[in-house]
Regions:
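Alpha-helical solenoid scaffolds in large eukaryotic transport, assembly, and signaling factors
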Residues: 1-37, 41-69, 109-113
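Core register positions within helices of long alpha-helical scaffolds
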Residues: 9, 47-52, 124, 139-146
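Buried hydrophobic core positions in alpha-solenoid tandem helical repeats
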Residues: 31-32, 124-126
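Acidic, serine/threonine- and proline-enriched intrinsically disordered linkers and terminal tails
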Residues: 54-125
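Glycine-rich, aromatic-bearing surface loops/beta-hairpins
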Residues: 142-157
Length: 157
């Protein structure tokens, strides 16, 4: 059974400045998968998912995000990325073409991907709102509310 330190090490690796941008959507997928494991500490996972969601939400409202202008090419790349990220049958193989796409994807889309991935997984999260463990139920409810009604940050340029 994983300890809280194990979970903290996992989220710390996802939050490192160098990797947060590129790993967070895949880290989020890992967290969602772990939520379905019987022995996983769901209270810790839900807390950490909420942390990553808030980071993505904040970053999506940054001055750089506000001036971001999507193009057909950028949207096409994001759709290709999303196709694998949202595909439960995708086994994780990253061929040369997909690695090239990941490296060229604008960082704005990594934040958007986290938010969209969580929104798509609200049905999974709702299963935990009725948990007998009050902490799990409260964290799941709080996370769903945050996803449905993202906080608006007063960010100035």
């Amino acid at each position: 059974v994983a300890t809280e330190k194990d979970y903290q090490n996992l989220i710390n690796s996802f939050e490192s400045q160098t990797w947060l941008i590129k790993l967070s959507p895949w880290g989020m997928r890992l967290y969602l998968t772990l939520l379905e494991e019987e022995k996983a500490d769901k209270a810790i996972l839900l807390r950490d998912i909420h942390t990553l969601f808030e980071a993505a939400n904040y970053s999506s409202q940054s001055p750089q995000a506000k001036i971001f202008k999507p193009t057909k090419g950028k949207l096409s790349k994001y759709e290709g990325y999303k196709e694998k990220l949202f595909n439960d049958a995708y086994e994780g193989t990253m061929d040369e073409e997909f690695l090239k796409l990941v490296k060229s994807l604008d960082r704005h889309y990594y934040h958007v991907a986290i938010m969209e991935l969580l929104e798509a997984n609200i049905p999974l999260l709702q299963r935990f709102t009725t948990s007998e463990d009050k902490i799990i139920a409260q964290r799941a409810t709080s996370l769903i509310e945050a996803i449905k009604h993202p906080k608006i940050y007063p960010i100035s340029q």
